[in-house]
Amino acid sequence: MLEIGFCTLEDQCPYLKDKRSRIEYNYIENCPKEINNELIKRGWRRFGRYFSRPICKDCDECLSLRILVNEYNFSRSERRVVNKNINTKVILRTPNLSNEHLFLYDKYHRFMEEKKNWKRYDLSFKQYYNLYVDGFMNFGYELAFYIEDKLVCVDLIDILEDGISSIYCFYDPDFSYFSLGKFSLLNEIQIAKKMNLDYIYLGYFVKKCQSLSYKADYTPNEILKGTKELFENEVLWEK
């Protein structure tokens, strides 16, 4: 298992305008599922063959959050979202790359650029592959959502030993009625329940960032306390 670690230089934080960020990376060529799981439990995120976590000076606003699947019950509004999507086709498969994927990805980010002032980058086939397809091994999947044979949402996930790691989701803003972002997460929860998995690892919750603060609405949940290195015995999560 080839592993290469490195860090970025300090830069503008993408989530909080008044903060600076620094990211630690681990490139792992053929990461076993159990190592992926241990890294995710310790606050790392996987994109392709790269694992990353923030190591920012004087800031700990990025908090790893996970949903407690066994205690999670769908609310009335969440059941309405499921009912609205009664005819939405959902396919669980290994990560794909197509013109359809890239078009949908670009459309979603153009919308977010206008709505939330996100920085948008044109992504090539190779860049998309490196970020969302490469390194899927025996744990990486995508949930592909179709309405009338049109790809309207892609939710990239890792199915691990104790839960599902939610990597990235993008959808067609023209289908906002269907609440596809929320519907994709509800599908993750349903899959985890069927597979007797304990957690949905949602990545980072940042209270002052609108794009990430919503994660706390999914309760019950737990927050990772502190940063633990790989193979340290105790990893503390608290409600």
Curated annotation (Swiss-Prot):
One of its GO terms (biological process) is ubiquitin-dependent protein catabolic process via the N-end rule pathway. It catalyses: N-terminal L-glutamyl-[protein] + L-leucyl-tRNA(Leu) = N-terminal L-leucyl-L-glutamyl-[protein] + tRNA(Leu) + H(+); N-terminal L-aspartyl-[protein] + L-leucyl-tRNA(Leu) = N-terminal L-leucyl-L-aspartyl-[protein] + tRNA(Leu) + H(+). Its EC number is 2.3.2.29. One of its GO terms (cellular component) is cytoplasm. Keywords: Acyltransferase, Cytoplasm, Transferase. One of its GO terms (molecular function) is leucyl-tRNA--protein transferase activity. It is found in: Cytoplasm. InterPro entries: Acyl_CoA_acyltransferase, Asp_Glu_LeuTrfase, N-end_Aminoacyl_Trfase, N-end_Aminoacyl_Trfase_C, N-end_Aminoacyl_Trfase_N. Its main location: cytoplasm. It is an enzyme of class 2 (transferase). It holds the Pfam family ATE_C. Belongs to the R-transferase family. Bpt subfamily. Functions in the N-end rule pathway of protein degradation where it conjugates Leu from its aminoacyl-tRNA to the N-termini of proteins containing an N-terminal aspartate or glutamate. This is Aspartate/glutamate leucyltransferase. It comes from Campylobacter jejuni (strain RM1221). The lineage of its organism: Bacteria, Pseudomonadati, Campylobacterota, Epsilonproteobacteria, Campylobacterales. The gene is bpt.
